[in-house]
């Protein structure tokens, strides 16, 4: 993602990409995401046919700054043609603003080192040996806090029966998605709320770690937050640091770009929703040695199909 991002920072409005792509989905979801997250046209010209045992899928296309396909040659040889409007002002309300002060750690490039050697020898928190494990995600759209609470408990019990070690539930699953400050205040849950004790007991009983989203209240302030409930009884909270325009109506921004959580099966990086569009944040978590990105998210009706 750094190439398109740098091109956009230098003022490019159109990204022209000759491709050797053999992914089955065409146009690729990756192309759509690069267009959406950077607010620029992507013109991707891909090869078609077989060469030396490789099947190139074709699917050349033109994608607008909203991530919508405006022209595509889905199969075989051919040309995709479209008019593009460089005066188009894409809707950026669902893309959080960047916070460069949180990304200073990106200058510490650890990739020249073998990951295991670096983190065992120099890191303040050495990596644990990774393990193969089962994880689960659930799509839940509750209408209120009570309904969401029951759905979460059912999901935890089901994950436990399946032998899953990690369960990731949606953003704001406890309470719902607020439109304004007043709604958020009604949905808010404190860290000392009895709901966490009950859910933690269920988590320990089912031997599964659970990550879910909710509105956090603390000292009269509200955050879009994630709760990480671990099977050892510990609880961890992440306050979303990159807010959309809608979220900024009611939420404070957190002070950390992502949360790092060590578990016996690997190191987890936690983000929330549209923060995945801010490419610096998952890169930071990768630099910190995360094996897994857990991203509770809520449906975004403004995103075209194919964009995460």
Predicted segments with their positions:
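Short, structured coil segments at secondary-structure junctions
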Residues: 10-11, 38, 65, 206
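Short beta-strand segments enriched in small/hydrophobic residues
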Residues: 124-146
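Hydrophobic/aromatic beta-strand patches that form the interior of the parallel beta-sheet core
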Residues: 16, 41-43, 136-138, 168, ...
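Short, high-confidence coil segments that cap the C-terminus of an alpha-helix
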Residues: 10-12, 131, 161-165, 208, ...
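Active-site catalytic loop in hydrolytic enzyme cores
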Residues: 1-13, 18-29, 33, 56, ...
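Cys-nucleophile CN-hydrolase/nitrilase-fold catalytic domain and related Cys-dependent amidase chemistry
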Residues: 21-40, 145, 149-240, 246, ...
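C-terminal beta-strand edge segments of enzyme domains
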Residues: 40-41, 47-132
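Short beta-strand scaffold segments in enzyme catalytic cores
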Residues: 44, 60-62, 80-82, 212-214, ...
């Amino acid at each position: 993602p750094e190439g398109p991002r740098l091109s956009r920072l230098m003022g490019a409005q159109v990204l022209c990409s000759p491709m050797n792509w053999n992914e089955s989905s065409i146009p690729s979801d990756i192309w759509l995401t690069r267009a959406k997250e950077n607010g620029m046209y992507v013109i991707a010209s891909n090869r078609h046919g077989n060469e030396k045992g490789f099947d190139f899928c074709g699917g050349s296309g033109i994608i607008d700054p909203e991530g919508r396909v405006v022209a595509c040659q889905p199969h075989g040889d051919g040309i995709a043609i479209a008019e593009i409007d460089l005066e188009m002002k894409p809707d950026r309300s669902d893309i959080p603003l960047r916070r460069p002060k949180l990304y200073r750690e990106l200058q510490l490039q650890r990739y020249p080192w073998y990951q295991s050697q670096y983190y065992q020898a120099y890191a303040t928190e050495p990596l644990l040996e990774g393990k193969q494990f089962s994880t689960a995600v659930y799509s839940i759209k509750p209408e209120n806090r009570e309904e969401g609470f029951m759905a979460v408990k059912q999901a935890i019990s089901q994950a436990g029966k399946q032998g899953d070690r990690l369960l990731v539930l949606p953003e704001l699953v406890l309470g719902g998605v607020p439109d304004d400050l007043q709604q958020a205040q009604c949905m808010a849950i404190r860290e000392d709320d009895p709901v966490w004790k009950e859910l933690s007991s269920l988590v320990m009983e089912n031997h599964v770690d659970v990550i879910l989203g909710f509105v956090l209240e603390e000292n009269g302030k509200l955050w879009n937050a994630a709760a990480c409930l671990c099977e050892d009884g510990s609880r961890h909270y992440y306050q979303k640091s990159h807010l959309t325009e809608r979220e900024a109506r009611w939420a404070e921004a957190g002070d950390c770009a992502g949360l790092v959580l060590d578990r016996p099966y690997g190191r987890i990086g936690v983000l929330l929703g549209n923060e995945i569009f801010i490419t610096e944040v998952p890169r930071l978590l990768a630099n910190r040695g995360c094996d897994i990105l857990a991203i509770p998210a809520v449906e975004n009706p403004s995103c075209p199909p194919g964009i995460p």
